[in-house]
From Swiss-Prot:
Zn(2+) binds at C145, C148, C158, C161. Gene3D superfamilies: HUPs (3.40.50.620), Isoleucyl-tRNA Synthetase, Domain 1 (1.10.730.10), Methionyl-tRNA synthetase, Zn-domain (2.20.28.20), Nucleic acid-binding proteins (2.40.50.140). One of its GO terms (cellular component) is cytosol. It comes from Pseudomonas putida (strain GB-1). InterPro entries: aa-tRNA-synth_I_CS, Anticodon_Met, Met-tRNA-synth_bsu_C, Met-tRNA_ligase_1, Met-tRNA_synth, Methionyl/Leucyl_tRNA_Synth, MetRS_core, MetRS_Zn. This is Methionine--tRNA ligase. It is an enzyme of class 6 (ligase). It catalyses: tRNA(Met) + L-methionine + ATP = L-methionyl-tRNA(Met) + AMP + diphosphate. Its EC number is 6.1.1.10. The gene is metG. Binds 1 zinc ion per subunit.
Amino acid sequence: MSEPRQILVTSALPYANGSIHLGHMLEYIQTDMWVRFQKMRGNQCIYVCADDAHGSAIMLRAEKEGITPEQLIANVQAEHSSDFADFLVDFDNFHSTHSEENRELSSLIYTRLREAGHIATRSVTQYFDPEKGMFLADRFIKGTCPKCAAEDQYGDNCEKCGATYAPTELKNPKSAISGATPVLRDSQHFFFKLPDFQAMLQQWTRSGTLQDAVANKLAEWLDSGLQEWDISRDAPYFGFEIPGEPGKYFYVWLDAPIGYMASFKNLCARRPELDFDAFWNEGSKAELYHFIGKDIVNFHALFWPAMLEGAGFRKPTAVNVHGYLTVNGAKMSKSRGTFIKARTYLDHLQPEYLRYYYAAKLGRGVDDLDLNLEDFVQKVNSDLVGKVVNIASRCAGFIHKGNEGVMVSGDAAPELTEAFLTAAPSIAEAYEARDFGRAMREIMALADRANAWIADKAPWSLAKQEGKQDEVQAICAQGINLFRQLVIFLKPVLPVLAADAEAFLNVAPLTWSDHLSRLENHKLNPFKALMSRIEPAKVEAMVAASKEDLLATQAKAPAGNGELTKDPLSAEIEFDTFAAVDLRVALIVKAEAVAGADKLLQLTLDIGDERRNVFSGIKSAYPDPSKLEGRLTMMVANLKPRKMRFGVSEGMVMAAGPGGEEIYLLSPDSGAKPGQRIK
């Protein structure tokens, strides 16, 4: 038998500035399932994580709440820890980036990079808020777009026309924090020389460490040439001061991934059998896996391995990237009640329902996963209650009534036993490859065969016949053994169901290799219901509660903090001015990302008798543009065509929202037809 593997696993660090929601849980649940599988196989698999606890956003929120940043992150960490535990995410350690271990490791890595010549310094001109006494990041500056004159745009890009620009190009800039007019000031900044690692990264990203789609995307960055990365921020800032540089702090994205190392080091201090150097030093034989969302690939697959290489540490074995979560086919929405916090879900439903549904839909790619709430109810009820638990509930009673709870020996269905044994390696292979959906399909196919066999034998009918009791016991003992096999296969996904089944089966905690054995002449404990069906009313209540969360948040907001306050009405115009704008219904025929543009989608629009090509800065809200195809929207059809770097834009689609992920493409009511005028 091969030696147990040494594996260290991480999930992306949740930001200590808000609650965990079901989109976050998609990552932590899949990581936890993979870790549980490895532990069941007898491998030494350590799962660490931490709260990402630094940055201006945390500093400003703490100030707003009248508490220290330390108090804020402690409160959030307690909330996060509770949510993870109740979702059965079993970290070996959940730490914080605001820790001594992280301070020491961040300083060490920076010092090594500096001594190796990988740190540069130069003066940077930035906007400075004279009222707050702080430099402003791009997202803390708002003003008028220098290209299209749209108001209330961020300091790095226009959400209306898609233009990108430097903050200094913004017209009428204002601090988003204080409302003051910022002034330009120079500041000395520190840069990590990422281009020094171009050759290494080109090889490493193509070495099997990433999914092909991710490696292909990173190739665009690599082919265009890497840029030096600004790793410093000026005081005031909540984070770690750069060694020997008073008033200069590490940018949050420098010390955040180092938080993986820090969390593990914190665990090593409490677990003497763990050796930090054996996992992190160059040449380590241990395996290191990061599970992350596709929005932070650049940090984990370019900056992070380059930092590790430059500082003399090992690089990840693989970075496993997943897509986003949608609910009912659309982005999570607070107004629709589909922006569901982890705690709101837990207040209404069992965590294993969602764990199973995620597992059933997760593949090894980076596609988005849709939580369709109707399908969620149907699938969990059908698969877990109607198939898996049904086997035990069908058979247990006959064994207790007819043989005092003792399973007879013998194999009543050798061909079925062999089918389960034969399937085990394939299921294990699917788990290992993170192809959880395939694993669940294969497991449920076995459950279908077991149920069909029991239904064909009909022990409930035989029990009524004279002299058939031995046959009944043989059938039901076989059924319980098949149920036990299914529990073993599902244990990484459903740890509570497995623990309850182990109690009923009267066995020690099941390991993966236990699928090779059977229970013979074995005493069972009394059967208790292992899982109840999802009641649709509870799902509806969860959605309603999520809407109430939004209303409660709005109720807490001070008067005058609504959308009109943030974005006041424009000056009145004459009707003729409005009438000059030709608004039309448009059918989105094709939607695709624009290569080399971070914000833009290219839309092909049908407006009845002709088609238009339109570039729109809505990519952040619609990461899978193909889902827009076939949808009706509204456009400005008589806007003068505008030549852009990527082509000519022949109009503008209509959308609402402040920007970023909160952009909502407008749609006409059903029945509208492409080309119809909007009046």
